[in-house]
Amino acid sequence: MKNLFSKALLLVGALFMLHTGVSAQDMPLPVDANVRIGKLPNGLTYYIRHNEKPKGQADFYIAQKVGSILEEDNQRGLAHFLEHMCFNGTENFPGNKIVSWLESKGVKFGQNLNAYTSIDETVYNISNVPIADVAVQDSCLLILHDWANALLLEDEEIDKERGVIHQEWRSRNVGQMRILENVLPTMYPDSRYGYRMPIGTMEVVDNFPYKALRDYYEAWYRPDQQGIVVVGDIDVDRIEAKIKEMFSHIEMPANAPERVYYPVADNEGTIFAIGADKEQSYPIIQMSFKTEAFPNEMKGNMSYLVQKYVMGMITDMLDNRFSDIANKPDAPFAQAGTIYGEYFVAKTKSALSFSGVAKDYDLVPVLQALYREALRAQQHGFTVGEYERAKNEYMSRLERAYNNRNDRENGQYVQEYVRHFIDNEPIPSIEDEYQLMQMIVPVLKVEMINQVLPQLITENNRVILAMLPEKEGFAIPTQEEFAQAMAAVEAETLEAYVDEVKAEPLIPNLPAPGKIVAEKALDQWGATELTLSNGVKVIVKPTQFKADEILFSATGNKGTALLSADNNTDIKNLDVVLSSNGLGTYTEIDLQKYLSGKQASVGLTIGNTSTELSGQSTPKDLPTLMELLYMTMTDVTITEDEFKSLQSKFAGILRNQESNPQYLFSRDAMKSLFENPRSIPITSADVEAANRENILNIVHSMTANAADYKFVFVGNIDMATFRPLVEQYIATLPADAKNIATEQINDPSMQVRNGKINDTYTAKMETPQTTVIIMASGNMEYTPKNVQVASVTGQILSKRLLDTVREDMGAVYSIGAACRMTRDAGKNATLVTQFPMKPEMKQEVLDFIAAEIDRMKGNVTQEEINTVIEFMVKSANEAKEKNGSWLNAISGWTVNGVDIFNGNVETLESITIDDVQKFLTDLMAQGNYAIVIQDPEVAAAE
């Protein structure tokens, strides 16, 4: 089949050449000169870059062009199994030594040490490693070496891991996954892609012979398929020499199998892949138009950059149209979107895909709406106004990245180099990319963009994927019904899209500016407190952490605890409304159009005991941030049509979730743990009963008095610019300093119930598993040290549970614990663990956890404390270089008067065994211990 899409893009490229005199087809993209790329004689590739964000740390990755697509039928699951085994013993790090050694250096398993396996790749990472000691650098490279070529793959460890992976399958074998397993063969006829989900089959996982895994490792983990990436505060020459020393001796295996990239065939007409499952949470449909993937060998040319930009514009503009439709009461979908990229799970085929989630159950009108807008864009194209907004938004984001070019963290570079190694994605410097796009974007007019879709949206190479909840009384649409629905849309006469843009100002009547009447230095924060003429106080901390970032928050003492029980339904709907509200005469869609090309946003959250505004902007867009802040405090709105649309959207989504075991457990658990009915998750009935006027009244009552709020700004702030903006937009807010809300730090009805709780619920589920929540709670003194001791306690317990319940018992895939403190009076400390598990081992695991908590009261080791504190000190030092950390710390201090940020490293280093044991003993002595369980429902015997 001819690739008409490629021809359309070549036409765009030709037009680009006419305007610039440059051939996009042939002009190579420059590679960032600051990354050193090399290849060893054995075929192994490496990328090394010096970067000091964060200072004194580095990331070490090994990427493998190996995934589940390479498995034979009797090997399904081995690629993923092998990834697990990389943490269970190597020649230089036997047993659990990789994890234990790295954690002793402040590298936390799961957070800084991890891996993933997909269909075409497997990637391992050791991130945020403190590397002041060069021996640590060498040891991290040695770990990568062992992963590449020196796994032990011991019989006993393989057998232990079978149970872990079986539990991972159990926890992930939800409705959507089961549907995918069933429909992928239809989506990929006569292709391996139809049968190669990475988890594999449990028949293989439970029974493969040890030699099969070792043979797979020998065949595929080899230098020509491996890439090493090291980015951080390192000596590039030294790391390169070490890579050559450690990895050059690795030999290619004899008779190595060819690494095949399996093609995906074109199809005449339309493929329909339809599946249903009782536990599918919502009905979703995806309409894909397949096309050839851009050749990897050509991605280094300008033509690829042009293609990415063009398709990005198309998907952005279509997404904006879908958002507009979704906000109408008669919209058939709750949400819809567009994506261009890999055809579902295959790298060797691309697709333009439209997807939508039905409000209730019927996917036929959703498919019609998606197809209708695709054809409208195909036939009439996009308007100049739409393209200008999308283009401005793109250039605004690119400009922000350019301005932050000296503040990029290691992880951003690593991800780019991994993608370059695996997919040959281009890696120009941000300076080069910014310069190139400033040249390309003005030349590409909307008329050029509009020539692409007519070639891509055709009657062939179409794939319809439908996934539905299986419900009694609801028929699953047939292939014929979907085909007829599409034919009906094709018969329609479609009008061009009308682009409506509001011209009036966001703030129609801006008051005369107020004044800054006093300034006070807050030395402990390196900040200044401004007192305004309306009595409001603003704290500002200028920083140089990021050139193009300003963050703000404002916390008020009012919350829903002030409201009577007859407001319960509307209180539950606050988050629904505040997810899609407008401001003044601007609807949510009007705001999206107004903000295109501006990097500024503000959100509002109303909690039980407080209300918070939060937002961000660039220095250039700080005036827009201030506009949004002013309007959020004074005039949050939602039209009747928008409200009805939200109701139908969320009510439908919730109705479909109400048979999902996870949703049912969240509802049941909250009933068991808390007394207040407001704690129970929102239902479809709650949404349908909501009152728009009352919700808006609640919102306005919470933001009516700006003097209730503590405003904090952190970032690259120029005070000469900042002061007049504060006087215009914050000093003019309605405020009454004589009637500030009383601080609400105690709402007993929202606290965990007293005493012992042991509740068990059951639910029907296709894949039986037990889910457990264990929570101990109590009242502890809120001090900076206790906050840190609580965290240390939770992390030590988490590590013990992981080592025993997962690694030794094989009862879970994932388990952890957390211990936290809040400023609330009453039960302000909680120790929580939640996990899904093998039902047969429930009592054994519960008994172990209870006994382990009891043991911890008297046998915490110094080694455990040192390991946790090493990680926490590293994290604390990282936080000192982040605007968000300072914002949270200052905001917390303004609310509760306790500084847990400054001096936190010294506090951590002072924690002793006695501190942890006493904290846990005092917490458990209060006798509040809850166990809430969901078991699979057992069918009654006939």
What are these regions (language model features)?
Residues M1-K7:
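Positively charged n-region of N-terminal signal peptides that target proteins for export
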Residues A8-H19:
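Bacterial N-terminal signal peptides
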Residues A24-I48, D235-Y309, I314-D319, S323, ...:
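Proteolytic maturation boundary segments
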Residues R49, P54-E71, L78-A79, N96-D146, ...:
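M16 family metallopeptidases and their MPP-like homologs
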Residues L78-C86, I314, L574:
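Active-site His/Glu-centered metal-binding helix of metallohydrolases
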Residues W101, A150-L153, E157-I158, L444-M448, ...:
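Peptidyl-prolyl cis-trans isomerase
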Residues A150, R162, Q176, L213-K244, ...:
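Non-catalytic, conformational "gating/processing" segments within enzyme and secreted inhibitor domains
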Residues E157-A212, Y216-Q225, V229-V231, V236-K244, ...:
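Hydrophobic, small-residue-rich alpha-helical packing segments that form membrane-like cores
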